[in-house]
């Protein structure tokens, strides 16, 4: 029985679990949306919520506390300048966990953990990627057309 066994051990020792959660939390704050297993998402949620609450305070002490937990200075800057102001009027509940199927290798349940209100930024990223992809495709087609035209203009057996 699991009476009074709070928290998630994730099949790791203490330092490995702490490193995993720090990496996951940093990735969530930098990317707005991360796919992971459902258990890791549930384990990371309270850490992200606490950091966003620190970001809403915005004082130097809070910034230093966040810097002690997060992996990069860029993540701290993004937390305090971009993510935390998004939730100025909200008291908690900054994340959403959406189940997304099962992992192929071991059948673990996968989920997206995402920051609420990040849909616009995610859509902009997706749109930029689609535009870049279309531009690359257009350049490739142009290069292929030029290559075919150059090949078609030369007489056969020109190497002899």
Swiss-Prot record:
Residue ranges with Basic and acidic residues bias: 123-141
Pfam families: Ribosomal_L17
Entry-linked SUPFAM superfamilies: Prokaryotic ribosomal protein L17
Positions of the UniProt region annotated as Disordered: 123-160
InterPro entries: Ribosomal_bL17, Ribosomal_bL17_sf
GO cellular component: cytosolic large ribosomal subunit
Biological process (GO), any one: translation
Keyword RNA-binding: no
UniProt keyword annotations, A-Z: Ribonucleoprotein, Ribosomal protein
Gene3D superfamilies membership: Ribosomal protein L17
Biased composition range(s): Low complexity: 142-152
Keyword Ribonucleoprotein: yes
Gene Ontology molecular function, alphabetical: structural constituent of ribosome
Top-level division of the source organism's lineage: Bacteria
NCBIfam families: L17
Family of the protein in this entry: Belongs to the bacterial ribosomal protein bL17 family.
Subunit structure of this chain's protein: Part of the 50S ribosomal subunit. Contacts protein L32.
Protein name: Large ribosomal subunit protein bL17
Gene that this sequence comes from: rplQ
